[in-house]
Amino acid sequence: MANLKEIRAKVASIKSTQKITRAMQMVAASKMRRAQERMAQGRPYADNMRRVIAHLVQANPEYKHRYMVDRPVKRVGYIVVSSDRGLAGGLNINLFKKVVQHVKAQREQSIEVEFALIGQKAVSFFKNYGGKVLGATTQLGDAPSLEQLTGSVQVMLDAFDKGELDRIYLVSNGFVNAMTQQPKVEQLVPLAPAAEGDDLNRTYGWDYIYEPEAEQLLNGLLVRYIESMVYQGVIENVACEQSARMVAMKAATDNAGQLIKDLQLIYNKLRQAAITQEISEIVGGAAAV
């Protein structure tokens, strides 16, 4: 059994660690709120762009853009969004399980897969998992910019344009609330079929005069829209990372507190036993005299 000095040292060490985990919890909570604000700020941009795309498509029904037309699927690409750092509970593990499950279903249909990776954790995972990686982006920080992501997006779009990919998916974590993050797989290209009530299904009674031509404008807008979807996925993943880290650090702080209580109880019992023994020795010595 540990002596009193060893227990005191353990308690001091755990208290020091507890201060760190509590500080990390508070920092993660602050970063999560900022990431949520960026999520809210980015949505109107993507929504308005989708409305303009919908109007262009309806105004030019004879023009079928390649990013909006399904074709036989032989090869698919995945843009996988993970975090750069750990200490986020099972956030990345659950995401990779989702990817592996989806990839397995594709391979069972003899469909080849390729990847573009965002985040150091994804890079590390796919080194062991294998698969053809077309590009990787890491060290995005807590406030990633759209410019940092264009490389990973463009390499996949280039492969699609060349016919090397027939479909592109975005895999990231969805922010449900501060306690819950849900990995999800979304079809990026071709644009997923519009749901009822979606802007792509809406009929507009007005028209614009476009400069440049509508087809040329649609080409650029679709690329920007796809980039914005990936950006939103990355920003949402940052919010998920920080919320998962906040929860993990709170659990670590609480566990440290419980461990300190348990060690303090052991310390008190040992100290009580030592005092009792000393008293017994004194009484025994006095009786001998």
From Swiss-Prot:
GO cellular component, one term: proton-transporting ATP synthase complex
Membrane topology classification: Peripheral membrane protein
Localization per Swiss-Prot or TrEMBL: Cell inner membrane
Keyword terms: ATP synthesis, Cell inner membrane, Cell membrane, CF(1), Hydrogen ion transport, Ion transport, Membrane, Transport
Presence of the UniProt keyword Hydrolase in the record: no
Keyword Transport: yes
BP terms from Gene Ontology: proton motive force-driven plasma membrane ATP synthesis
GO MF term (any one): ATP binding
Function: Produces ATP from ADP in the presence of a proton gradient across the membrane. The gamma chain is believed to be important in regulating ATPase activity and the flow of protons through the CF(0) complex.
Homology family: Belongs to the ATPase gamma chain family.
Quaternary structure (record): F-type ATPases have 2 components, CF(1) - the catalytic core - and CF(0) - the membrane proton channel. CF(1) has five subunits: alpha(3), beta(3), gamma(1), delta(1), epsilon(1). CF(0) has three main subunits: a, b and c.
Protein name in UniProt: ATP synthase gamma chain
Lineage: Bacteria, Pseudomonadati, Pseudomonadota, Gammaproteobacteria, Moraxellales
Gene name, Swiss-Prot/TrEMBL: atpG
